[in-house]
């Protein structure tokens, strides 16, 4: 069986890792052994933070809704309870967007919620 020389595949593998580590500081971006570790760690952070991102955005939306509803006289928990009673099915992302960009629309939703809470 003929001898297999791995120069081509090794170079391709190295190029792939170094391309992924482009923009990293110092030897993390241009020395293969260190770049390989840096790319692995970056991948772990990316995997973890794709999941964390969902939690962080939900927290942000809740904080924005809470702040906007408190300005209009309701806490977040009272507001969400009123939304359920008023059968208004708008998700937190849309409510937070309304609270920031369209205060009049958010205010009208809060008024509907207050009316439903007062009736109950």
From Swiss-Prot:
<protein>
    <recommendedName>
        <fullName>Large ribosomal subunit protein bL20</fullName>
    </recommendedName>
</protein>
<comment type="similarity">
    <text>Belongs to the bacterial ribosomal protein bL20 family.</text>
</comment>
<dbReference type="Pfam" id="PF00453">
    <property type="entry name" value="Ribosomal_L20"/>
</dbReference>
<dbReference type="GO" id="GO:0000027">
    <property type="term" value="P:ribosomal large subunit assembly"/>
</dbReference>
<keyword id="KW-0699">rRNA-binding</keyword>
<dbReference type="GO" id="GO:0003735">
    <property type="term" value="F:structural constituent of ribosome"/>
</dbReference>
<dbReference type="GO" id="GO:0019843">
    <property type="term" value="F:rRNA binding"/>
</dbReference>
<dbReference type="GO" id="GO:0006412">
    <property type="term" value="P:translation"/>
</dbReference>
<keyword id="KW-0694">RNA-binding</keyword>
<keyword id="KW-0689">Ribosomal protein</keyword>
<comment type="function">
    <text>Binds directly to 23S ribosomal RNA and is necessary for the in vitro assembly process of the 50S ribosomal subunit. It is not involved in the protein synthesizing functions of that subunit.</text>
</comment>
<dbReference type="InterPro" id="IPR049946">
    <property type="entry name" value="RIBOSOMAL_L20_CS"/>
</dbReference>
<dbReference type="InterPro" id="IPR005813">
    <property type="entry name" value="Ribosomal_bL20"/>
</dbReference>
<dbReference type="GO" id="GO:0005840">
    <property type="term" value="C:ribosome"/>
</dbReference>
<keyword id="KW-0687">Ribonucleoprotein</keyword>
<dbReference type="GO" id="GO:1990904">
    <property type="term" value="C:ribonucleoprotein complex"/>
</dbReference>
<dbReference type="InterPro" id="IPR035566">
    <property type="entry name" value="Ribosomal_protein_bL20_C"/>
</dbReference>
């Amino acid at each position: 069986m003929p001898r297999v020389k791995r120069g081509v595949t090794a170079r391709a593998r190295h190029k792939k890792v170094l391309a992924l580590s482009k923009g990293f500081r110092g030897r993390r971006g241009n020395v293969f052994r260190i770049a390989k570790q840096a790319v692995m760690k970056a991948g772990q952070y990316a995997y973890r933070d794709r999941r964390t991102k969902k939690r962080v955005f939900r927290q942000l939306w809740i904080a924005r809704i809470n702040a906007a509803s408190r300005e209009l006289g309701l806490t977040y928990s009272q507001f969400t309870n009123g939304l359920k009673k008023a059968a208004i099915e708008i998700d937190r992302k849309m409510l937070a967007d309304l609270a920031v960009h369209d205060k009049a629309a958010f205010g009208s939703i809060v008024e509907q919620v207050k009316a439903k809470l007062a009736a109950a």
